[in-house]
């Protein structure tokens, strides 16, 4: 690679030579100019996150950072980290969904109306929607692991208190609020960890794998609840079980999870800790990071950490996000791509939670099902949620890869990922409408579950794609971006769970879910507007 010398006394730490320059924002999201000799046969022109970089600092000789991988962790270590975040990602939705099959029982136990007992779901979802804004802001600056430890520890304590709560509805609602605050961290923290470890070209399926945890909540929670509620006096063990599984997650985090936030640990290579721009030591020797040494070790990285080095190259490769403020969230919330995708996702969640909350009630009253049968019926939409996320995530990455092969010198339009959501929204609309009329006319339970499954499939198909899109769009604020999206969708879920019983009474079940289905045409419109205006809105620095 030919180079040009830099003779100025003050210049950017990354001088430009006469080699071809590639902007790394396409596949890396790290704000740095990388120099690439495209004649080098070892360089994959479609894989710009692992490049041979040549960096010139002021007047000093060139230092070589060879083939820096996106992540320094081995496949086994990445799999282990994914296992931990998937498991802990399961805990939040588990806490919310294990409660739902018990609503008819708890209504009798606490001697309250259906609307009042549904309020315990509403306050949980409302808190679950707002709290990630707090966790996400800290996670993008202070680190992932310490927030996992704090939030899961709080989950353990609150579940102990819930298991012994007196039969007073006020106490139950209060503790559910605290439970929601603690458990709301796991999705934004997990999504941030996934983005730390996986490059954008693999981000869709990586997010799909992570979402196995959150999506398993709606599948396993009703079954677990049904088994626990075989004896109606055992409803307190719902929270005892949550305490046990949360404690297991906390142990895994403390013992095995490393810090992954890129502005603190970079790509996880331990060599960064002992490396800096030292001309006396490095003027004649290239610095080779192609054989990284991962920072993974037992019981490590506990606490709020500083960057492992103050070196300017490290800071250029792995920049800190701008200082957080309330205005940061307001700017993110009002950024058109974020608000449009969040509205689309929120309306889908509104419809899904209306189905989820009413299904147990209708199965008990209209079909005379036992608690165990009710729990088993939730398996169908739960499995469909898994399938929607996995198929959508893998297909999204496959379409991206095909596009890059044909346009390898062109930056991939991130909004192209959202094309897939059109199919998901249409499936969700059909599922909602079919579910309502099947209940209205008391059709066979298989028809009810098929339409509920279609709604669940369409929801996660869209949700996975939107999360992947946001993680690429706001690469320095991944947890915050996911938190904003979660805020909108969980607020919508809270409102729907609070009002759905009265809406069904006033409108009739069929017309109620017809309206909920058709309102998702707004979701479809939002996505189409974003795709058609993809060049209009330029990503700002958040």
UniProtKB/Swiss-Prot annotation:
Topological category with respect to the lipid bilayer: Multi-pass membrane protein
Location within or outside the cell: Cell membrane
Glycosylation sites noted in the Swiss-Prot or TrEMBL record: 6, 46, 111, 118, 274, 463
Keywords: Cell membrane, Glycoprotein, Membrane, Transmembrane, Transmembrane helix, Transport, Virulence
Highest taxon listed in the record's lineage: Eukaryota
Entry keyword Glycoprotein: yes
Primary role: Plasma membrane acetic acid exporter, relieving the stress induced upon cells within hemocytes, and thus enabling increased proliferation and virulence against Galleria mellonella larvae. Confers resistance to weak acid and oxidative stress, but not to antifungal drugs.
Protein name, per record: Multidrug transporter DTR1
Organism expressing this protein natively: Candida glabrata (strain ATCC 2001 / BCRC 20586 / JCM 3761 / NBRC 0622 / NRRL Y-65 / CBS 138)
Lineage, opening ranks: Eukaryota, Fungi, Dikarya, Ascomycota, Saccharomycotina
Gene (UniProt): DTR1
């Amino acid at each position: 690679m030919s180079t040009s010398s830099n003779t100025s006394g003050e210049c950017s730490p990354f001088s430009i030579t006469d080699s071809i320059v590639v902007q790394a924002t396409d596949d890396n999201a790290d704000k740095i100019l990388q120099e690439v000799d495209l004649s080098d046969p070892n360089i994959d022109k479609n894989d710009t996150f692992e490049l041979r970089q040549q960096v010139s600092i002021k007047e000093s000789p060139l230092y070589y950072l060879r083939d820096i991988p996106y992540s320094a962790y081995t496949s086994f270590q990445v799999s282990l980290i994914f296992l931990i975040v998937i498991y802990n990602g399961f805990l939040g939705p588990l806490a919310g969904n294990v409660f739902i099959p018990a609503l008819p029982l708890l209504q009798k136990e606490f001697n309250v109306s259906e609307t009042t007992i549904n309020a315990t779901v509403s306050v949980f979802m409302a808190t679950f929607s707002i709290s990630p804004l707090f966790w996400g802001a800290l996670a993008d600056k202070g680190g992932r692991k310490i927030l996992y430890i704090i939030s899961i520890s709080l989950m353990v304590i609150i579940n102990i208190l819930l298991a012994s709560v007196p039969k007073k509805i006020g106490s139950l609602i209060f503790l559910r609020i605290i439970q929601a605050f603690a458990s709301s961290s796991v999705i934004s923290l997990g999504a941030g960890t996934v983005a730390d470890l996986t490059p954008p070209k693999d981000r869709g399926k990586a997010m799909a794998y992570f979402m196995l945890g959150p999506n398993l909540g709606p599948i396993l929670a009703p079954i677990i609840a049904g088994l626990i509620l075989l004896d109606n006096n055992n409803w307190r063990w719902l929270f005892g079980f949550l305490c046990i599984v949360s404690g297991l997650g906390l142990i895994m985090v403390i013992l095995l999870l490393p810090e992954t936030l890129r502005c603190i640990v970079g790509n996880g290579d331990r060599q960064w800790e002992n490396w800096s721009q030292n001309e006396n030591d490095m003027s004649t020797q290239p610095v080779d990071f192609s054989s990284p040494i991962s920072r993974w070790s037992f019981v490590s990285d506990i606490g709020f950490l500083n960057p492992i080095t103050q070196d300017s190259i490290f800071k250029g490769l792995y920049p800190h996000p701008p200082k957080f403020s309330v205005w940061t969230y307001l700017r993110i919330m009002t950024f058109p791509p974020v608000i449009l995708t969040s509205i689309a996702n929120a309306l889908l969640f509104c419809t899904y939670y209306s189905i989820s909350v009413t299904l147990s009630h209708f199965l008990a009253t209209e079909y005379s099902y036992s608690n165990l049968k009710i729990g088993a019926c939730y398996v169908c939409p739960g499995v469909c949620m898994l399938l929607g996320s996995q198929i959508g995530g893998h297909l999204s990455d496959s379409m991206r890869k095909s596009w890059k092969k044909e346009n390898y010198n062109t930056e991939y339009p991130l909004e192209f990922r959202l094309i897939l959501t059109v199919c998901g929204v249409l499936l969700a609309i059909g599922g909602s409408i079919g579910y309502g009329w099947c209940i209205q006319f008391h059709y066979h339970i298989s028809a009810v579950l098929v339409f509920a499954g279609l709604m669940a499939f369409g929801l996660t198909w869209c949700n996975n794609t939107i999360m992947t899109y946001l993680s690429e769009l706001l690469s320095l604020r991944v947890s915050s971006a996911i938190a904003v999206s979660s805020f909108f969708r969980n607020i919508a879920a809270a409102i729907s769970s609070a009002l759905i019983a009265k809406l069904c009474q006033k409108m009739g079940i069929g017309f109620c879910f017809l309206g909920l289905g058709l309102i998702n045409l707004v979701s479809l419109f939002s996505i189409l507007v974003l795709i058609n205006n993809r060049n209009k809105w330029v990503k700002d620095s958040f």
